[in-house]
Curated annotation (Swiss-Prot):
The lineage of its organism: Bacteria, Pseudomonadati, Pseudomonadota, Gammaproteobacteria, Enterobacterales. ATP binds at P91, I92, G93, S94, G95, L96, G97, S98, S99, A100, C101. Belongs to the GHMP kinase family. Homoserine kinase subfamily. GO terms for molecular function: ATP binding; homoserine kinase activity. This is Homoserine kinase. It catalyses: L-homoserine + ATP = O-phospho-L-homoserine + ADP + H(+). Keywords: Amino-acid biosynthesis, ATP-binding, Cytoplasm, Kinase, Nucleotide-binding, Threonine biosynthesis, Transferase. Its main location: cytoplasm. It is found in: Cytoplasm. It is an enzyme of class 2 (transferase). Pathway: Amino-acid biosynthesis; L-threonine biosynthesis; L-threonine from L-aspartate: step 4/5. Coiled coil: none annotated.
Length: 310
């Protein structure tokens, strides 16, 4: 049997709409991500378990994991009979890369089960394609960090899909999911078709300078540049309490705060454990809306999708 875990991811990371993503994992060892187990079988089967299993489609054929199995078999040119078990530990429509997580973990598990017939580039192309079935268009800002780990910048030039942007070891990423769902399609539809020239210039400056600050090891500058002029001004209205939360965590001492993907999860970056704990406490008390919500203090997950030992 092969068992694979893939971590949650932050799409956009505020400053890099559709071109920057980061994988995160809780510091306390909680699995904030999906697991898939694959075993030999006479015929295909898919079972689901986990905290958020009731949010999955009732019919296995509608599950993206089943579709990933189908597409993987097409890619390798043979039907591979397996029994798959999906452990859904990620809420759907959360802004944590839930669909990307299921795509990555399913394809990595199948590839490992079959002796890795596909290389990383082939896998990443498949992942982007499968993610596109759910999000409506091929993009890699969740699947790339989920698969490869760390913070990934989408290049999509010279045959290179993404490359790593170095993060900062002392950054703690406080992730707060309020327990409500935001449709990615709705969050995209609310964005304007055209942007002002000044916004385009600002966006380019923030992203270029952020990547520069990461490579030249300037954490204070990098945090200062984590500004979103593309999505956040419009998506805030879809996220009850986000504006107040951003102000509050900044007052506590967070270096930056933004929307994870299309929301409703937010992230706040801190460089001290005591600050992160205070931010987490405030978000737990004021940003969560029901029992499905949660807050985790995380670090960048530099490993990405990986085999697990039972």
């Amino acid at each position: 049997m092969v068992k694979v875990y893939a971590p949650a991811s932050i799409g956009n990371v505020s400053v890099g709409f559709d071109v920057l993503g980061a994988a995160v994992s809780p510091v306390d060892g909680t699995l904030l991500g999906d697991c898939v187990s694959v075993s030999r079988a006479d015929s295909f089967s898919l079972q689901s378990a986990g905290r958020f299993v009731d949010k999955l489609p009732a019919e296995p054929e509608q599950n993206i994991v089943y579709q990933c199995w189908q597409r993987f078999c097409e890619a390798v040119g043979e039907t591979v009979p397996v029994a798959m078990l999906l452990e859904k530990n990620m809420p759907i429509g959360s802004g944590l890369g839930s669909s990307a997580c299921s795509v990555v973990v399913a394809l990595v598990a199948m590839n490992a089960h079959c002796g890795r017939p596909l290389n990383d580039d082939q896998m990443l192309m498949l992942m982007g394609e499968m993610e596109g079935r759910i999000s409506g268009g091929v993009h890699f800002d969740n699947v790339a960090p989920c698969f490869l780990g760390g913070m990934q910048l989408m290049l999509e030039e010279n045959g290179i899909i993404s490359q790593t942007v170095p993060g900062f070891d002392d950054w703690l990423w406080v992730m707060a999911y309020p327990g409500i769902k935001v449709s990615t399609a709705e969050a995209r539809a609310i964005l304007p078709a055209q942007y002002r020239r000044q916004d385009c210039i600002s966006h380019g400056r923030y992203l270029a300078c952020f990547v520069h600050a990461c490579h030249t090891r300037q954490p204070a500058l990098a945090a200062k540049l984590m500004k979103d002029v593309i999505a956040e001004p419009y998506r805030t209205r879809l996220l009850p309490g986000f504006a107040d939360a951003r102000q509050a965590v900044g007052d506590i001492g967070a270096l930056a705060c933004g929307i994870s993907g299309s929301g409703p999860t937010l992230f706040a970056i801190c460089d001290r454990q005591d600050t992160a704990s205070r931010v987490a406490d405030w978000l737990t008390q004021h940003y969560l809306q029901n029992d499905e919500g949660f807050v985790h203090i995380c670090r960048l997950d530099t490993s990405g999708a990986r085999l697990m030992m039972d």
